[in-house]
Structure formats: C-alpha cells, structure tokens
C-alpha cells in the first residue's frame, strides 16, 4: 500500500517535463496510430472482398 501511495503521489505531482512522460505519450501516440492504420487496413480488405 505504501508503494501504491508513493506512485499516486508522483502521478499527482505531474512532472510533464520528465523523459518518462515523453516516452509514455509517444508510446500511446504510436499505438493509437498503429491501431487506426490497422482498422483502416481491415476495412479496405473487407470492401475489396
């Protein structure tokens, strides 16, 4: 419980300038783009069939 509260405290502090946060945002952006491209690809394949 102590570890969880420490993590929550760090999240609440919101160190947006940290490298970890930049990597996290970049990772989510890449995942979002990949999922969007994948869904578009699947839709195109279904239409062609």
Curated annotation (Swiss-Prot):
Entry annotated with the keyword tRNA processing: no
Positions bearing carbohydrate: 3
Tissue expression from the record: Expressed in the spleen. May also be expressed in other lymphoid tissues.
Residue pairs linked by disulfide bridges in the UniProt entry: none
Keywords annotated in UniProt: Adaptive immunity, Glycoprotein, Immunity, Immunoglobulin, Membrane, Transmembrane, Transmembrane helix
Keyword Glycoprotein belongs to the record: yes
Localization per record: Membrane
Entry's transmembrane regions: 25-45
Biological processes annotated in GO: adaptive immune response
Membrane-related topology note: Multi-pass membrane protein
Entry GO terms, CC: immunoglobulin complex; membrane
Top-rank taxon, per record: Eukaryota
Protein name in UniProt: IgW transmembrane form Tm2T7/Tm7T7/Tm3T3
